[in-house]
Protein backbone atom coordinates (compact mmCIF):
# COMPACT_ATOMS: atom_id res chain seq x y z
CA UNK A 1 0.00 0.00 0.00
CA UNK A 2 1.26 3.47 -0.85
CA UNK A 3 1.95 5.85 2.01
CA UNK A 4 -0.36 8.88 2.16
CA UNK A 5 1.21 12.33 2.37
CA UNK A 6 -1.23 13.53 5.02
CA UNK A 7 -2.56 12.14 8.30
CA UNK A 8 -5.58 14.43 8.73
CA UNK A 9 -7.17 16.59 6.02
CA UNK A 10 -10.16 18.79 5.34
CA UNK A 11 -11.57 18.00 1.92
CA UNK A 12 -13.49 20.96 0.48
CA UNK A 13 -15.87 19.79 -2.24
CA UNK A 14 -17.58 22.00 -4.81
CA UNK A 15 -21.35 21.91 -4.39
CA UNK A 16 -21.82 22.61 -8.10
CA UNK A 17 -19.89 19.46 -8.96
CA UNK A 18 -22.43 17.29 -7.11
CA UNK A 19 -25.02 18.17 -9.75
CA UNK A 20 -23.02 16.49 -12.50
CA UNK A 21 -24.07 17.25 -16.06
CA UNK A 22 -27.56 18.32 -14.93
CA UNK A 23 -26.21 21.51 -13.41
CA UNK A 24 -28.69 21.47 -10.52
CA UNK A 25 -29.51 19.16 -7.63
CA UNK A 26 -27.69 15.90 -6.99
CA UNK A 27 -26.27 13.32 -9.39
CA UNK A 28 -26.20 9.86 -7.73
CA UNK A 29 -23.31 8.75 -9.94
CA UNK A 30 -21.17 11.71 -8.87
CA UNK A 31 -21.98 11.04 -5.20
CA UNK A 32 -21.06 7.37 -5.55
CA UNK A 33 -17.79 8.15 -7.35
CA UNK A 34 -16.79 10.66 -4.67
CA UNK A 35 -17.78 8.27 -1.89
CA UNK A 36 -15.59 5.53 -3.35
CA UNK A 37 -12.59 7.85 -3.40
CA UNK A 38 -13.27 9.02 0.15
CA UNK A 39 -13.47 5.39 1.27
CA UNK A 40 -10.16 4.64 -0.48
CA UNK A 41 -8.49 7.54 1.33
CA UNK A 42 -10.10 6.51 4.63
CA UNK A 43 -8.87 2.94 4.17
CA UNK A 44 -5.28 4.26 3.93
CA UNK A 45 -5.63 5.44 7.51
CA UNK A 46 -6.14 9.11 6.67
CA UNK A 47 -8.54 11.02 8.93
CA UNK A 48 -10.99 12.73 6.57
CA UNK A 49 -13.16 15.73 7.37
CA UNK A 50 -15.30 17.22 4.61
CA UNK A 51 -16.85 20.62 3.94
CA UNK A 52 -19.20 20.79 0.98
CA UNK A 53 -20.55 23.85 -0.81
CA UNK A 54 -24.14 24.51 -1.86
CA UNK A 55 -23.78 25.84 -5.41
CA UNK A 56 -25.84 22.98 -6.83
CA UNK A 57 -28.88 24.32 -4.95
CA UNK A 58 -28.33 27.95 -4.03
CA UNK A 59 -25.90 30.85 -3.80
CA UNK A 60 -26.38 33.76 -1.42
CA UNK A 61 -25.49 36.32 -4.08
CA UNK A 62 -28.28 34.91 -6.27
CA UNK A 63 -30.72 35.84 -3.54
CA UNK A 64 -29.26 39.34 -3.40
CA UNK A 65 -29.83 39.71 -7.14
CA UNK A 66 -33.47 38.76 -6.52
CA UNK A 67 -33.74 41.53 -3.96
CA UNK A 68 -33.52 39.30 -0.89
CA UNK A 69 -31.93 40.35 2.35
CA UNK A 70 -28.29 39.14 2.29
CA UNK A 71 -28.49 37.37 5.64
CA UNK A 72 -31.65 35.47 4.66
CA UNK A 73 -30.09 34.43 1.35
CA UNK A 74 -26.97 33.21 3.14
CA UNK A 75 -29.03 31.19 5.62
CA UNK A 76 -30.73 29.46 2.68
CA UNK A 77 -27.31 28.50 1.32
CA UNK A 78 -26.30 27.31 4.77
CA UNK A 79 -29.29 24.95 4.84
CA UNK A 80 -28.47 23.70 1.34
CA UNK A 81 -25.07 22.54 2.58
CA UNK A 82 -26.88 20.32 5.08
CA UNK A 83 -28.80 18.64 2.26
CA UNK A 84 -25.53 17.98 0.44
CA UNK A 85 -23.89 16.69 3.61
CA UNK A 86 -26.72 14.22 4.27
CA UNK A 87 -26.60 12.98 0.68
CA UNK A 88 -22.84 12.50 0.88
CA UNK A 89 -23.14 10.76 4.26
CA UNK A 90 -25.63 8.31 2.77
CA UNK A 91 -23.34 7.56 -0.19
CA UNK A 92 -20.30 6.99 2.05
CA UNK A 93 -22.15 4.83 4.58
CA UNK A 94 -23.41 2.59 1.78
CA UNK A 95 -19.73 1.66 1.40
CA UNK A 96 -19.61 0.65 5.08
CA UNK A 97 -17.68 3.69 6.32
CA UNK A 98 -19.02 5.25 9.52
CA UNK A 99 -19.79 8.91 8.84
CA UNK A 100 -21.01 11.74 11.03
CA UNK A 101 -22.59 15.02 9.94
CA UNK A 102 -21.94 17.91 12.31
CA UNK A 103 -23.76 21.20 11.82
CA UNK A 104 -22.80 24.72 12.89
CA UNK A 105 -26.49 25.45 13.53
CA UNK A 106 -28.25 23.02 15.84
CA UNK A 107 -30.73 20.63 14.21
CA UNK A 108 -30.44 17.61 16.48
CA UNK A 109 -33.07 15.53 14.70
CA UNK A 110 -30.88 15.65 11.58
CA UNK A 111 -27.25 15.75 12.72
CA UNK A 112 -24.93 16.37 15.64
CA UNK A 113 -24.06 19.93 16.63
CA UNK A 114 -20.44 20.84 15.96
CA UNK A 115 -18.31 20.38 19.06
CA UNK A 116 -14.59 20.57 18.41
CA UNK A 117 -13.48 17.84 20.80
CA UNK A 118 -16.21 15.49 19.62
CA UNK A 119 -15.25 16.07 15.98
CA UNK A 120 -11.62 15.20 16.72
CA UNK A 121 -12.73 12.11 18.64
CA UNK A 122 -14.81 10.93 15.68
CA UNK A 123 -11.78 11.30 13.42
CA UNK A 124 -9.55 9.44 15.87
CA UNK A 125 -12.09 6.60 15.93
CA UNK A 126 -11.83 6.30 12.15
CA UNK A 127 -15.08 8.00 11.21
CA UNK A 128 -15.47 10.41 8.32
CA UNK A 129 -16.83 13.74 9.54
CA UNK A 130 -18.83 16.11 7.32
CA UNK A 131 -19.09 19.69 8.55
CA UNK A 132 -22.31 21.33 7.39
CA UNK A 133 -24.09 24.69 7.74
CA UNK A 134 -20.92 26.67 7.08
CA UNK A 135 -19.73 28.66 10.08
CA UNK A 136 -23.32 29.07 11.24
CA UNK A 137 -23.28 32.74 10.29
CA UNK A 138 -24.29 34.74 7.22
CA UNK A 139 -21.63 36.67 5.28
CA UNK A 140 -19.16 33.78 5.57
CA UNK A 141 -18.52 31.33 2.73
CA UNK A 142 -18.07 27.58 2.91
CA UNK A 143 -14.40 28.25 2.03
CA UNK A 144 -14.12 30.16 5.29
CA UNK A 145 -15.88 27.29 7.06
CA UNK A 146 -13.28 24.88 5.64
CA UNK A 147 -10.43 27.10 6.84
CA UNK A 148 -12.01 27.51 10.28
CA UNK A 149 -12.66 23.79 10.77
CA UNK A 150 -9.18 22.91 9.49
CA UNK A 151 -7.67 25.20 12.13
CA UNK A 152 -9.93 23.81 14.85
CA UNK A 153 -9.17 20.14 14.18
CA UNK A 154 -5.49 20.84 13.38
CA UNK A 155 -5.69 19.44 9.85
CA UNK A 156 -2.43 19.14 7.95
CA UNK A 157 -3.93 20.58 4.76
CA UNK A 158 -7.08 21.72 3.01
CA UNK A 159 -7.65 19.81 -0.22
CA UNK A 160 -9.66 22.28 -2.29
CA UNK A 161 -11.62 20.39 -4.93
CA UNK A 162 -12.65 22.51 -7.90
CA UNK A 163 -14.96 21.61 -10.77
CA UNK A 164 -13.14 21.37 -14.09
CA UNK A 165 -10.20 23.59 -13.10
CA UNK A 166 -6.84 21.96 -12.42
CA UNK A 167 -5.33 24.49 -10.04
CA UNK A 168 -4.78 28.22 -9.62
CA UNK A 169 -4.49 30.53 -12.66
CA UNK A 170 -3.81 34.24 -13.08
CA UNK A 171 -7.27 34.53 -14.69
CA UNK A 172 -10.23 32.25 -15.35
CA UNK A 173 -8.99 29.57 -17.80
CA UNK A 174 -12.58 28.88 -18.89
CA UNK A 175 -12.74 32.44 -20.24
CA UNK A 176 -9.11 33.21 -21.07
CA UNK A 177 -7.37 30.39 -22.93
CA UNK A 178 -4.04 32.18 -22.37
CA UNK A 179 -4.41 32.05 -18.58
CA UNK A 180 -1.17 31.11 -16.82
CA UNK A 181 -1.26 28.33 -14.23
CA UNK A 182 0.70 28.42 -10.99
CA UNK A 183 2.34 25.26 -9.65
CA UNK A 184 2.91 26.98 -6.33
CA UNK A 185 1.82 30.33 -4.93
CA UNK A 186 2.00 32.04 -1.53
CA UNK A 187 -0.95 33.23 0.55
CA UNK A 188 0.33 36.79 0.12
CA UNK A 189 0.27 36.47 -3.68
CA UNK A 190 -3.26 35.07 -3.59
CA UNK A 191 -4.43 38.09 -1.60
CA UNK A 192 -2.40 40.70 -3.49
CA UNK A 193 -3.35 39.43 -6.96
CA UNK A 194 -6.91 38.50 -5.98
CA UNK A 195 -6.43 34.97 -7.31
CA UNK A 196 -9.61 32.91 -7.21
CA UNK A 197 -8.52 30.21 -4.76
CA UNK A 198 -10.89 31.01 -1.91
CA UNK A 199 -12.20 34.25 -0.48
CA UNK A 200 -9.85 36.64 1.30
CA UNK A 201 -11.15 35.80 4.79
CA UNK A 202 -10.49 32.09 4.27
CA UNK A 203 -7.05 32.73 2.75
CA UNK A 204 -6.04 34.99 5.64
CA UNK A 205 -7.21 32.38 8.15
CA UNK A 206 -5.10 29.71 6.45
CA UNK A 207 -2.11 32.07 6.35
CA UNK A 208 -2.40 32.94 10.05
CA UNK A 209 -2.61 29.25 11.00
CA UNK A 210 -0.08 28.01 8.41
CA UNK A 211 -2.53 25.59 6.80
CA UNK A 212 -1.40 24.57 3.29
CA UNK A 213 -4.05 24.55 0.56
CA UNK A 214 -3.94 22.12 -2.35
CA UNK A 215 -6.16 23.21 -5.26
CA UNK A 216 -7.07 20.50 -7.76
CA UNK A 217 -9.73 19.29 -10.18
CA UNK A 218 -11.94 17.02 -8.08
CA UNK A 219 -13.68 15.57 -11.14
CA UNK A 220 -10.56 13.92 -12.59
CA UNK A 221 -10.22 10.11 -12.27
CA UNK A 222 -9.16 9.24 -8.70
CA UNK A 223 -7.80 12.75 -8.22
CA UNK A 224 -8.72 12.88 -4.52
CA UNK A 225 -6.80 9.67 -3.87
CA UNK A 226 -3.83 10.83 -5.95
CA UNK A 227 -3.62 14.20 -4.20
CA UNK A 228 -3.62 12.48 -0.80
CA UNK A 229 -0.77 10.26 -2.01
CA UNK A 230 1.15 13.31 -3.21
CA UNK A 231 0.93 12.41 -6.89
CA UNK A 232 0.90 15.09 -9.57
CA UNK A 233 -2.56 15.75 -11.02
CA UNK A 234 -1.83 19.34 -12.02
CA UNK A 235 -2.61 20.72 -8.57
CA UNK A 236 -1.44 24.06 -7.19
CA UNK A 237 0.07 24.37 -3.71
CA UNK A 238 -0.76 27.48 -1.69
CA UNK A 239 1.44 28.03 1.35
CA UNK A 240 3.79 30.42 3.11
CA UNK A 241 7.33 31.23 2.06
CA UNK A 242 8.89 28.91 4.64
CA UNK A 243 6.44 26.00 4.47
From Swiss-Prot:
Its EC number is 2.7.4.22. GO terms for biological process: 'de novo' CTP biosynthetic process; UDP biosynthetic process. Pfam families: AA_kinase. GO terms for cellular component: cytoplasm. It is found in: Cytoplasm. Keywords: Allosteric enzyme, ATP-binding, Cytoplasm, Kinase, Nucleotide-binding, Pyrimidine biosynthesis, Transferase. Residues 20-25 are annotated as: Involved in allosteric activation by GTP. Allosterically activated by GTP. Inhibited by UTP. GO terms for molecular function: ATP binding; UMP kinase activity. ATP binds at residues 12-15, 55, 59, 163, 169, 172. Pathway: Pyrimidine metabolism; CTP biosynthesis via de novo pathway; UDP from UMP (UMPK route): step 1/1. It catalyses: UMP + ATP = UDP + ADP. InterPro entries: AceGlu_kinase-like_sf (IPR036393), Asp/Glu/Uridylate_kinase (IPR001048), Uridylate_kinase (IPR011817), Uridylate_kinase_bac (IPR015963). Coiled coil: none annotated. UMP binds at residues 74, 135-142. Homohexamer. Belongs to the UMP kinase family. Catalyzes the reversible phosphorylation of UMP to UDP. This is Uridylate kinase. It comes from Symbiobacterium thermophilum (strain DSM 24528 / JCM 14929 / IAM 14863 / T). The gene is pyrH.
Amino acid sequence: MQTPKYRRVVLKLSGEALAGAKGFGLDPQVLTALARQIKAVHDMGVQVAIVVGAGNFWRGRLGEQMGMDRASADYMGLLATVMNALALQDAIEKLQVDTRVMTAVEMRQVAEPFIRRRAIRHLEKGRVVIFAAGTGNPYFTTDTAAALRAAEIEAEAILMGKQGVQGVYDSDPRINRHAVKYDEVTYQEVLAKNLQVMDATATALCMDNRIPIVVFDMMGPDHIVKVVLGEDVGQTFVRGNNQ
